[in-house]
């Protein structure tokens, strides 16, 4: 399950125009827990359902265009990116457990997308809307402390030697502080 969620986060980063995942979004669900084939009709139906169109009055293509919805996304409920660590934390942990080199490549793409779009003259700032395709990225005057304390720590650790804060010897609390596991 953790692998699927992490791979889903990576996919979501790649699916967005800026290469950065939004804070809150809804996807079209597969009918079962098994992988499913792409179903454009199901996507359109879910987009309209999320928009509240029970009577069929809305044009689905117009909604998709106006809402800037990539395929599979039924809604982007919070388009901000506030420099959160959870996605890269998941990539880091899965990488340390599996050793999958593709996870480092994905982490590098995530890092570059974040740096390219959030960098300011002094630091990094949250983004108001990650769905913009017109180059009008709004970097807000906001940098939560978890950017430095957690997000950048996980980006650093995924490219460090695996014995640096090894998951065999340490666990992380919710604030990304490593604690030695008693032996």
Regions inferred by a protein language model and the residue ranges of each:
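Glycan-recognition and catalytic cores of secretory/periplasmic carbohydrate-active enzymes
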Residues: 1-183
